[in-house]
C-alpha cells in the first residue's frame, strides 16, 4: 500500500489550510477527488468544495473549485441564534458524500449549504438553506449549479433561497431549481439522486 499527498498547505502564503473530507470516485478512466477547503477551520468562512483528477493516483491536477464560497439570504432561517447572522451570511459547505453516478451515466456532484452563527454551530444542524448539484462532464469540466432540494424544514423555499457572490458587490447569483435545466438526462439523474437518502444526508 502506498500513500500519496495530493495537497500541501502553507499558512505563511495565505493558502487555505483546512482541507478535509476527501471523496473519491472513478469516472471516464480517471480518478476524481473532492474535498472541503477552508481558510482556517471547520464551520468557518470562507470555504468551498474543490476537486482534482488523476490518471494513476500518483500525479494529480491542480485543484479547481467545484462548489464556490457564497453568501446566502437568512430571512428564512428558523434556527437558533439568528441574531448572530447578517442578512447575507456566509454559506458554509457540508457533505457526507459528494459524487453520484446515475444509471444513465451522468456523474452528479452535490453539497449542502448551511449556516454557522458561531464556530460551535455546525452547518448541518437542520437549519441550512439548500442542497446544490452540478454535473461533472466526461472532460471533467462542470455544468452550471442547480438547487436540487430546498431545506423546507429549516424555513427555506424557492422564494427565499437566494445566494450572493461574496466579492464586493454581493451580486445575486442565478441558481435555478434543477427541473429548469434544458438537459433532460441531467434532470433524470437528479430525480434518481433524490431517491438515494444516504447520499443526501
Regions found by a protein language model. Give the residues of each.
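Beta-rich carbohydrate-recognition and catalytic domains
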Residues: 1-17, 26-92, 101-201
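Conserved beta-strand position repeated once per blade in WD40 beta-propeller domains
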Residues: 21-23, 96-98
